[in-house]
Curated annotation (Swiss-Prot):
Residues 623-634, 670-681, 700-709 have a biased composition (Basic and acidic residues). Component of the NOP7 complex, composed of ERB1, NOP7 and YTM1. The complex is held together by ERB1, which interacts with NOP7 via its N-terminal domain and with YTM1 via a high-affinity interaction between the seven-bladed beta-propeller domains of the 2 proteins. The NOP7 complex associates with the 66S pre-ribosome. Residues 380-497 form the BRCT domain. Its main location: nucleus. It comes from Ajellomyces capsulatus (strain NAm1 / WU24) (Darling's disease fungus). Belongs to the pescadillo family. One of its GO terms (molecular function) is RNA binding. Gene3D superfamilies: BRCT domain. The lineage of its organism: Eukaryota, Fungi, Dikarya, Ascomycota, Pezizomycotina. It is found in: Nucleus, Nucleolus; Nucleus, Nucleoplasm. This is Pescadillo homolog.
Length: 723
């Protein structure tokens, strides 16, 4: 037994020595390990270190990061990640920079750097022609096709990232050409944007649009993906120097490649040839969308999405007459052959068309859940304006209106020849026009200058502004946007020229339960007693204004009275002085006597307060008598006896007295509800109580904002009613 214990003791001592040796070795390894080889120092790299590692310049590094979609990161501890005493400001993931080492564009950047050195050397030797030849023939061309495939493995991924691309390209399409924004880039952006718009027109994919301060928002649905972009208004844009157009130009270079891929895929998916035919001469005349001609890949005839009349006025009239003759011949042939259509076939076709319509589910009970309703379908969008012929006046924005009308089925749109080529008709008096979009105020005909007349018949060459053609509907541009957002045709009389337009609301912001709804009336969304409180507050403000007005008039009258008294007393003194001693001053002895008498009287005077009280009471009685006399005069002028006017005043006072207990009752009820809520909160846990407090705070804030908006609307409506 003793020997066994000795062996166990030796074994423990041996193991203890091994454990101590392991601890010593681990400490040595920990001390010898370098800092910055693990943790945040290993995961992050600064921008300077990344540029040195890739061996490119800083502008090329920025371009490469934009192309590859790599952006700076924010570490938790900048001091640990920077590996230096002073923390850096810009960090990247080390893995991202390691990923960039294998990018083929690095070779192109290095070739560009070598070429720039050769060009600088040639210019230094004075060989300008050699430098131009090097720049023209040896400039490396960047291809971003492989980057598009890497960043967007599927076409749906590309559609999801199309919002920013469209917004930036539409922005550059409306910029003026400068040294920082060349005309070649602007032309490319315009062409790609028009091609994308043509796809939306051909497929009726546009769903919503909204006019805002920033520009015009559009929303389209392509393959189930909602795409929203912003188009600026066509004002004269001023290019400022505080914007770095080199970085924006890099984004434009990437987004043009992306949109080119997307347009090709979209066109081929519906059987159209990409790129579509482009008429440069027509585009120079301002045709824009009409300069493109879509062609089918599997059909012999061209797909005409836009109807234009490119003939001169005389040829257009000849074409109209020939078309009428052809139609008459076709009608005669049909009458001779007696082709009858079966009504059953027509009914079945109508049923098949109705099958594709989207059903709307409306809740039966008010307490039932409301399902999100489906949006307008492509067929309904394509037939919204299909039966109309529009004419856009010169003052209306032609480009957005043309795009919207064509996207929702309109094939015949005319405008003035000043706005450009590509219109269905340039004649404002064309009998085929059903709707005219006008955005100018109503002016009297006498204030307009005379128009030039035709030398042949003496008639005016063009209709005068403000003239109305019988049988034509005149609307303002907002009617088009509101009809599209509502998915149906609205009343045109609400949008007549000169009429006060209804509010233009965002189609993507739905009114909440506790929020303010500008479409609903005030009576439907006011809280209990809110109108009475507003009336009381308004009466109180009016009373204060009347009191302040009366006080100001009284002060003015008193000042005028004092001025008149002073003037009269001054006139009397001057006349008295002139009558005594030929205008000489009176001896000062009397003044001294009077002053001494006044001084004695001041020493002996008592009871000033009683006299002052008596004078104030007499003034009050005089004021009451004067006010009563004034009221009698007002009642007599109104044709009422004084008793009736006094009864009306007593009625208003009685109404105010009756409203006071109502306000007290509401305050008591509100206090009771708050006490009940506090009593219920006592039974909750701390977590639920905090959540309830947050909900109550947000609801109160929302209610206050809604009440403020309702109060503003109430004042506007009262002002309109007074007018």
């Amino acid at each position: 037994m003793a020997g066994r214990l000795r062996e166990e003791r030796k074994y423990r001592q041996k193991n203890r020595g091994l454990v101590q040796e392991r601890i010593r070795l681990s400490l040595v390894v920990w001390e010898s390990r370098k800092q910055g080889t693990s943790g945040q120092a290993k995961n992050f790299i600064t921008r300077t270190q990344a540029v040195r590692k890739l061996q490119i310049s800083l502008p090329d590094f920025r371009r490469l990061c934009i192309f590859k979609g790599i952006y700076p990161r924010e570490p938790r501890n900048k001091k640990k990640a920077s590996k230096a005493a002073t923390p850096s400001t810009t960090f990247y993931y080390t893995r991202d920079i390691q990923y960039l080492l294998h990018e083929p564009l690095l070779k192109k950047f290095r070739e560009q750097k070598a070429l720039s050195k050769k060009i600088a050397r040639a210019l230094g030797r004075g060989e300008v022609g050699n430098a131009a030849r090097l720049e023209k023939n040896n400039a490396p061309k960047l291809s971003l096709d492989h980057i598009i495939k890497e960043r967007y493995p599927t076409f749906i991924d590309a559609l999801r990232d199309l919002d920013d691309a469209l917004s930036l390209l539409f922005l550059f399409a409306n910029l003026p050409s400068t040294t920082s924004v060349p005309a070649k880039t602007i032309t490319l952006c315009q062409r790609l944007c028009h091609e994308f718009q043509h796809y939306l027109i051909a497929t009726n994919s546009l769903r919503k649009s909204f006019l805002s301060i920033k520009g015009i928002y559009y929303q389209a649905t392509i393959l189930g993906q909602d795409i929203m972009w912003l188009v600026p208004y066509r004002f004269v844009q001023r290019v400022t120097g505080d914007v770095d157009y080199r970085i924006m130009g890099t984004f434009v270079e990437f987004y043009t490649t992306l949109l080119g891929f997307v347009n090709y895929k979209l066109y081929t998916s519906i059987g159209l040839v990409y790129p579509p035919k482009f008429d440069k001469s027509s585009d120079e005349r301002g045709a824009e969308l009409a300069a493109f001609t879509l062609e089918g890949r599997y059909f012999g005839e061209a797909h005409k999405a836009i109807e234009t009349s490119r003939q001169p006025n005389g040829s257009a009239e000849k074409a109209a007459t020939t078309s009428k003759e052809l139609q008459a011949k076709v009608d005669n042939i049909l009458e001779k052959t007696q082709l009858d259509t079966d009504p059953t076939d027509q009914s079945t076709e109508d049923q098949e068309e109705n099958i594709e319509a989207i059903d709307k589910f409306e809740p039966i009970a008010p307490e039932a859940d409301s399902l999100p309703q489906p949006q307008i379908s492509g067929d309904e969008a394509g037939s919204l304006f299909a039966t109309f012929t529009f004419y856009i006046s010169r003052e209306a924005p032609r480009a957005p209106l043309e795009f919207l009308l064509r996207s929702f089925g309109c094939k015949r749109i005319g405008w003035d020849s000043v706005l450009g080529d590509g219109a269905f008709t340039h004649d404002e008096l064309d009998a085929r026009i059903t709707h005219q979009i006008v955005d100018r105020p109503q002016l009297p005909q006498a204030s307009l200058p005379p128009l030039p007349k035709n030398p042949e018949d003496g008639t005016e060459a063009a209709p005068r502004p403000g003239t109305r053609v019988p049988g034509r509907t005149y609307i303002q541009p907002q009617w088009v946007w509101d009809c599209i957002n509502e998915g149906k045709l609205l009343r045109p009389d609400l949008y007549a020229p000169g009429a006060t337009l209804p509010p233009h609301l965002s189609p993507w912001v739905k009114p909440s339960e506790r929020g303010y709804d500008p479409r609903a009336s005030l009576a439907d969304q006011e809280e209990e007693g809110e109108a009475e409180r507003a009336a009381e507050a308004e009466e109180y403000e009016n009373d204060e204004q009347e009191e302040s007005g009366e006080e100001s008039t009284k002060s003015k009258q008193s000042k005028e009275l004092l001025a008149n008294l002073a003037r009269d007393s001054g006139d009397e003194n001057t006349s008295g002085d002139e009558s005594v001693n030929g205008g000489m001053d009176i001896a000062m002895a009397e003044d001294t006597d009077e002053s001494s008498d006044d001084g004695d009287g001041a020493d002996k005077f008592e009871g000033f307060d009683q006299d002052e009280d008596m004078s104030s009471e007499s003034e009050d009685e005089e004021e009451k008598a004067r006010s009563q006399h004034q009221k009698e005069l007002e009642a007599e002028a109104a044709g009422l006896p004084f008793s009736a006017s006094s009864q009306a005043e007593s009625g208003t006072i009685r109404g105010k007295k009756q409203q006071a207990p109502l306000a007290k009752k509401r305050a008591a009820q509100k206090k009771k509800e708050e006490e009940e809520l506090e009593r219920q909160k006592m039974m909750m846990s701390r977590k639920k109580r905090k959540l309830l407090d947050k909900m109550i705070y947000s609801n109160k804030k929302q209610d206050a904002e809604a009440e403020k908006l309702r109060q503003k609307r109430r004042k506007i409506e009262q002002g309109l009613n007074k007018k």
